[in-house]
């Protein structure tokens, strides 16, 4: 059994213009768990820092118990500090090898008060796209799906889009180890980086 996670690295301003490039998933070896985040920037990073520096946890099942209360607190502070709009949200995904040595995953959504929601086994994507039939190469399959995601999002009104860009990073977790690597770079990465630098 294994778990693979793929993300882009582009973080945008509310208007969709490039802001920074960041790591959107992190691996905590002592918990055998990958944490990934979407939506409002910084929520995942604060949660990972808290788990790593200020909590005693036995594994992902223990994390699922403690996540709601702690994420609600982190979210409330972010709402007050940054005056977040009502339509701004955050989702945190937790994927790992459990205390019972089984693959397990759950998500915590601001739209559901950060309750721990168990994820089913199999593929999961955000935003929506189709799975490439018959593809056996992970890197190639992810590249196909992300290209389709970008195409779908480009067809939507600007204020409804999820922006994807920068580089694609992949994490591959097994019971014994976790590897991460850069899978590919989006064709407009350099242009996005130039735009981001202008905003500083």
Model-derived features: positions:
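Structural motif
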Residues: 101-107
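Short hydrophobic alpha-helical segments used for membrane anchoring or interfacial signaling
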Residues: 93-99, 171-173
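Short beta-strand elements
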Residues: 94, 107-112
């Amino acid at each position: 059994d294994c778990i693979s996670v793929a993300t882009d690295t582009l973080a945008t301003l509310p208007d969709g213009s490039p802001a920074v490039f960041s790591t959107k998933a992190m691996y905590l070896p002592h918990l055998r768990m990958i944490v990934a985040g979407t939506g409002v920037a910084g929520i995942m990073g604060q949660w990972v820092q808290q788990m790593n520096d200020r909590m005693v946890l036995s594994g992902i099942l223990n994390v699922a118990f403690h996540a709601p209360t702690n994420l609600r607190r982190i979210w409330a502070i972010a709402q007050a500090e940054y005056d977040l709009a009502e339509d701004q949200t955050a989702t945190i995904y937790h994927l790992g090898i459990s205390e019972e040595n089984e693959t397990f995953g759950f998500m915590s959504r601001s739209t559901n008060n950060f309750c721990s929601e168990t994820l089913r086994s199999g593929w999961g994507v955000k935003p929506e796209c189709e799975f490439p039939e018959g593809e056996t190469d992970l890197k190639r399959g992810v590249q196909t799906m992300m290209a389709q995601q970008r195409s779908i999002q480009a067809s939507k009104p600007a204020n409804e889009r999820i922006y994807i860009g920068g580089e694609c990073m992949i994490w591959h977790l097994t019971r014994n180890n976790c590897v991460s690597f850069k899978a590919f770079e989006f064709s407009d990465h350099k242009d996005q980086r130039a735009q981001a630098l202008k905003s500083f």
